[in-house]
Amino acid sequence: MAKKAIKKFKTAFTELLGKYSYDDLTIVNVSDAAKVTRQSFYYHYESMEDFVFDVLRDELDEAVNKERRKSGTLTATFVRIISACRASKTETSNLYNSSLKEELVDFFNNYIEDLIREQIGALLQASPRTMSEEALQFVTAQYRNMFRSILEDYIRTGMKEKPTDIGKGIDRFVGRSLDQVLTDFSDEAE
């Protein structure tokens, strides 16, 4: 029953967010639309925000796909994220233009950083090299800030560009793969 209730909540929320502003939605609205009790909602989630970020994490994880997270390029993974945002354009815009905006930007920041760290870990495991913690933090922060800024600007300006065009622009701008960047920042390169 728990998985069914959660699925009903998520489906109802997504449908409601496509029609109404996030700030106008309540747990009562979502529970009524899902035809599940509020008590059931609170059994699974502490708050509406907790629920929203669970929905977002699931949607992005599905778009990114756990297997492709480590094997694809970082840009390709990012393109899948912005494609998922564009596929849910109304819902994404409603969340971004709500009282949840700051938390949403923080969520994307953390989500993107986790993906970058996973990919760095996979690359360092496949091709071992020594890097200082400072170098790892610097590379992670630069990629995170770039991707977060692009994503935030993309949402803010209405998600008009094709995600693949953004990916091509990133590749042209960066000019090399994450693996090459890690090699350049490795202790062996010094």
Task: Give the role of each language-model region.
Residues 156-190:
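C-terminal peripheral helix-coil segments that are non-catalytic and often amphipathic
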Residues 66-67, 89-99, 120-127, 154-158, ...:
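Secondary-structure edge/capping motif, primarily at the C-terminal ends of alpha-helices
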Residues 21-24, 160:
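Residue at a beta-strand N-cap/secondary-structure junction
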Residues 102-128, 134-152, 179:
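Amphipathic alpha-helical packing segments from all-alpha helical-bundle domains
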Residues 72-90, 141, 145, 149, ...:
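Amphipathic alpha-helical segments that line or abut small-molecule/effector binding pockets
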Residues 2-14, 23-24, 32-35, 42-75, ...:
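An amphipathic alpha-helix adjacent to DNA-recognition modules
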Residues 13-17, 60, 64, 86, ...:
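Regular secondary-structure segments
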